[in-house]
């Protein structure tokens, strides 16, 4: 079984923990408990290019609060996928994807070369909630739209934008989509590298390998 390390980052109260608990334990926590660090695991069988493959998802939950800024990166080494979370009803958490979280990942990318970024919008059930809309309107804001999420993902060079609600919809499908996109992007990188090597050689030219005595 293949293992994939997935680290969730983003502002506190964006729904990271609820989402992971719902995915792995099929229950929705009613009380908000701030996370320091937590690990979860989920096993999934996912079709990749028409072939069913089994994966063990190692899910790392991190604290978004500023007081954990020096500790949080300790979970980054060896990461395959970073999930950058924002909450659709919290525009500030959306802005902080670019203001904080992308910069933090970039600062530690040496410990996780090849890691891919995905932007995840949570609490989609609140996008059409009248109370949420009214509260945000009073502050001159609005629930983040799907289009805005897609544009943000493109802006920061993420693989994709996905969204879901841990309460109501689309949770397992989101993780299937993320894993499929991750492995398809890796295949494209390998294919591109192979094509570059092929084009670099002149027609009929033999490949010469130099071996050092040292």
Q: Where are the regions that the model predicts?
A:
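Post-Walker A helix-loop "phosphate-sensing" segment adjacent to the P-loop in P-loop NTPases
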Residues: 25-33
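Switch II (G3) loop of P-loop NTPases
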Residues: 54-68
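Adenine-nucleotide cofactor-binding loop residues
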Residues: 63, 89, 167
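Inter-motif core of Ras-like GTPase G domains
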Residues: 68-91
């Amino acid at each position: 079984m293949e293992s994939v390390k997935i680290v969730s980052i983003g502002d506190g109260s964006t729904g990271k923990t609820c989402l992971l608990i719902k995915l792995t334990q099929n229950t929705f926590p009613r009380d908000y408990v701030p996370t320091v660090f937590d690990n979860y695991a989920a096993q999934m069988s996912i079709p990749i290019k028409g072939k069913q493959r089994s994966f063990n998802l190692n899910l790392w939950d991190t604290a978004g609060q500023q007081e954990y800024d020096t500790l949080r990166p300790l979970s980054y080494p060896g990461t395959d996928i970073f999930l950058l979370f924002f909450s659709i009803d919290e525009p500030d958490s959306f802005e902080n994807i670019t203001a904080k979280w992308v910069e933090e990942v970039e600062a530690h990318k040496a410990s996780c070369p090849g890691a891919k970024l995905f932007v995840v919008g949570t609490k989609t059930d609140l996008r059409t909630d009248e109370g949420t809309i009214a509260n945000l309107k009073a502050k001159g804001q609005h629930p983040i739209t799907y289009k805005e999420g897609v544009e943000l993902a493109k802006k920061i060079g993420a693989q994709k934008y996905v969204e879901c609600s841990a309460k109501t919809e689309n949770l397992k499908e989101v993780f299937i989509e993320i894993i499929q996109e991750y492995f398809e992007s890796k295949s494209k990188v390998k294919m591109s590298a192979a094509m570059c090597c092929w084009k670099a050689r002149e027609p009929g030219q033999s490949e010469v390998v130099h071996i050092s005595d040292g």
